[in-house]
Swiss-Prot record:
Organism of this sequence: Mus musculus
Family: Belongs to the Ca(2+):cation antiporter (CaCA) (TC 2.A.19) family. SLC24A subfamily.
Protein's UniProt name: Sodium/potassium/calcium exchanger 5
Cytoplasmic membrane side: 88-111, 158-170, 216-305, 356-362, 422-438, 492-501
A Pfam family reported for this protein in Swiss-Prot or TrEMBL: Na_Ca_ex
Amino acid sequence: MRTKWGPTWTRRVLLLGIFWVSAYLPVRGVSLPPRLPRATGNSTQCAVSPASEFPEGFFTKQESTDGGIVIYFLIILYMCMAISIVCDKYFLPSLEIISDSLGLSQDVAGATFMAAGSSAPELVTAFLGVFITKGDIGISTILGSAIYNLLGICAACGLLSNMVSTLSCWPLFRDCAVYAVSVGAVFGIIFDNRIYWYEGAGLLLIYGLYVLLLCFDTTISRHVMKTCSPCCPCLARAMEERIEQQTLLGWEDESQLFIRRQSRTDSGIFQEDSGYSQLSLSLHGLSQVSEDPPSVFSMPEADLRRIFWVLSLPIITLLALTTPDCRRKFWKNYFVITFFMSALWISAFTYILVWMVTVTGETLGIPDTVMGLTLLAAGTSIPDTVTSVLVARKGKGDMAISNIVGSNVFDMLCLGLPWFIKTAFTNASAPIEVNSKGLTYITISLNISILFLFLAVHFNGWKLDRKLGVVCLVLYLGLATLSVLYEIGIIGNNRIRGCGV
């Protein structure tokens, strides 16, 4: 089957530029970011510099100030391009085949495999905190990307998508409800500033129940929509639309529905907009037309595309030598390897990106708390942003939104795994000590962001478009600004100074 994943090179440049600009906007804004632990002693607090968790930069501070910082900027842009290529050519095609093989709907695929793959950097960061850096793997790591993922990435999907996607009520309601439960669970666990092994296991159990819910999503959604439709009009409309589609097309699999309702040419060819497959109508029914995509080493014809192709050739070669291209017929059966290898490369490129961003922030003299809420947060969320925007541009709004919320659920609940390992095996004699100062404010911020997202989608007519993108951007900037003011002590009583200052 042929795959046409990815935007054109011109659009890719635009995406990378916007992602780079977004790195300087206040993001996440709920607590200290990953790799920014708080050291407590008596009644004072201090923030350990995020640079302490990374190797030294290539240049001295003076050399960086004299022009070496330009190299850091170029590496950051190059890593953004590398992440985009991995997601475009390997990660999303493997996800498509996995979803098709398991018969998953768009929203379920987005909330499970897509969320897990794009959130791999956060999980790797947590394990590094357990086994290598010995840093705080508490509240800052769990809640770091919440507001940005919920509102910031949704804004990016709406503003950068070239088509309007119709959203379903049930997937958003399901994921937001589970996320609210996750927030409550974490609130209860870290309220006493200590984490025990059974509490980490409890988070894993909740995530297991969430996966079980997704496995029976079709049956559960029908029951919920039938029961709640009298009091919830949006659920009633969702049920009517699903019944109409199944009655009209005679297919119950949503992935097949998506293929059939995309477009129909005069020659009788059904073709999915994403280019995943071509279906031709014959006397024997639908027959599949297979064709491998062009080689990644084929030079584009346009001059601008050639320039970017040459620049990205080292990354293209590295990926071609290490990761099977499951879009091609020969490697199609190796899609599981493609999925895990692409997630591994996403984690590696994200680590380098965040490392360079940290060194850049140190060179520019940005305070640690502000840098954690801006540069580091945006860097670690680049994979989620790229994957969500790419699928939104293909018209798969449910998959994009489910990935946005599902990534938060994955980050929060699956961090019970490193907690469980640390308390049950690595250091079984003592619980994990975490800092829950400001927990009430954080919980309120998360619940407000969940409510804002659901209401924004509802009042926008359940459409993912530029209007929704603007609304989410305004809401996000407002909450993020308040969070930055809270962290630097302008509002509240939570001023954090740098350790050693």
